[in-house]
Amino acid sequence: MKTRRRILSIVLTIAILLLLVLDIPVTAAGTKKVDVLFTHDTHSHLDSFSTIVDGQQKEVGGFAKIKTLIDEKKKDNPDTLVLDGGDFSMGTLIQTVYDTEAAELRMLGYLGYDVTTFGNHEYDYRSKGLANMLKAAINSGETVPEIAVCNVDWDAMEKDGLNDGQKQIKEAFEAYGVKDYVVIQKGDTRIAVVGVFGKDALECAPTCELLFKDPVEAVKQTVAEIKKNENVDMIACVSHGGTWEDEDKSEDEILAKKVPDLDLIISGHSHTELNEAIKHGNTYIVSCGEYGRNLGSLSMTQKEDGRWEMTSYELIPVSDEIKPDQETQKRIDELMDTVDTNYLADFGYTRDEVLAENDVEFNSLEEMGTKHEELNLGDIMSDAYVYAVENSEYYDGNPVDVAVVPSGTVRDTYTKGNITVEDVYNSFSLGIGKDGVAGYPLINAYLTGKELKLAAEVDASVSDFMTTARLYCSGLNFTYNPHRMILNKVTDCYLTREDGERIEIQDDKLYHVVTDLYTGQMLGSVMKMSYGLLSLEPKDKDGNPIENLEDQAIMEDCRELKAWDAIARYMKSFEDTDGDGIANVPEYYAATHNRKVVDDSTNIIDLVKNPNRFSVMIVLICLLFLVIIILIVVLVRKLVRKVKKKSM
């Protein structure tokens, strides 16, 4: 008996020593663990790309490298769950074959993604384009991820009768198998994954014809259905709602608080990069940034009460140190070859054609969100609009007074070295025109001088709350003071010509403005941020309100002039300063030119001088509230005195 005990003691001691030496993790018997990899907002960035990160030029992203990382993780745990938070399309040349090849969705399937959802940019190709893309994915015969979205309001649409676009999408959803949620078995763990489309995402989808239920209420109902009908261990959500600095307006934080049964939210749409997960109650919110620059990785362990604890979390940089999977890269290259023949050939380009050599350090994309000032990246794009319109062989002779590029339409910057057609397209890669061809067209519109000043005020007062509304202009210069009262921050606003001459703006005069179609369509959202106080109404040259902005597309012999093509033409037009036969980006763009001047004065006179009608209104409202408060205080005091007198 003693011998057996000694043997047992020796065996246990050896086992404990082995565990310590080999660092084998010890978990309670029956404890369930889930490993998750995730992305969101990859925006057609199948290939790696060069951009500016923290002031340095780097090669980042790429599905071939992400495939390498996923395969490595799955070697350790074949049951790793792979999720995506939507906006997998619209951002590079590959989107030009979106509706015929479904390249993005097929590549997500090839990489081993389990579930994705729709972002606002999946609707950029309109109902027909989205429907065709889903059908192309099915017809490819390849493995594709499940798609979940729980808040499409088919009942409301069917009550009013489905229009043609809604019918097309409904048929495509049914054919693909789009669901409110999907249940996935990973090892010994059953996981329900809910998909949801956010409120702000809908605001950013002007061509979407679908109606949606309130995201929180829809997820709440779906989770209740899951708990009633499915025996699952975990409930995750792929959300295209986003997180924001203001917690009260942060959609996925609101979702976490109001639907506490969610264990994990993959948060897309806001392009947020969370180095630490956000936690509300027992719900974790994670985000890894845009364009596949990072692959999110986390592990969760089930606790005794059935809820889950995040035991590890990291954002893995998809850098040039990672070896790309060769078979994946081959598939990407084959898909990219179709772009040259099926799209760029119609414009007379190839994707690797060098348009200009660049020695200028342009602002990064991140700086457009963090710096509220003139940026050279916006300057060159807005100047390109003017050049392309006024140098078109179909130019009608009507000079462009102002060209406008909002930061929300800019998708990447230009690095030093050769700028190719692909680089230019990727910098402005959104949408589709009325002609059904990829790329938003430039449009003609007219605004009064008074409205031009309001546009400057939109930038000065609204864009800190909605950074996508930051405006970069050619022809319009203004100065603003960030310390002045909201809606009265602009202190100087005027027009300039090519020679720099200052021209005063006449309030009642109509001015010729060129911008892209998406910007025109998004005016409503920007105006909503000012609660209707700032109203811009695009007009035709006769001053009549424009009913359909698509009809204002600038045409060249029945073809739309695309915004990206305007930039490409401008790049190609630059002087060849080194004699090698290739244009060079001018030194002019190495500096700024007082197009947007920030006056940081806190002098009381500078803060209150020249009040406009908005500041007067705000002051009057504040005074009214002050008078009301004083009256209430006076009345309360009188009542208190009366009560005291009666009690004496």
Model feature map: region roles:
Residues 1-3:
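N-terminal secretory signal peptides that target proteins for export/translocation
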Residues 5, 13, 252, 382:
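Generic structural marker for isolated residues within well-ordered, non-membrane alpha-helices
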Residues 6-25, 626-632:
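Sec-dependent N-terminal signal peptides of Gram-positive bacterial secreted proteins and lipoproteins
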Residues 7, 99, 432-433:
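Hydrophobic alpha-helical segments with strong N-terminal bias
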Residues 27-321, 384, 446, 463, ...:
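Acidic, metal/ion-coordinating pockets
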Residues 30-38, 44-69, 75, 110, ...:
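Catalytic centers of hydrolytic enzymes
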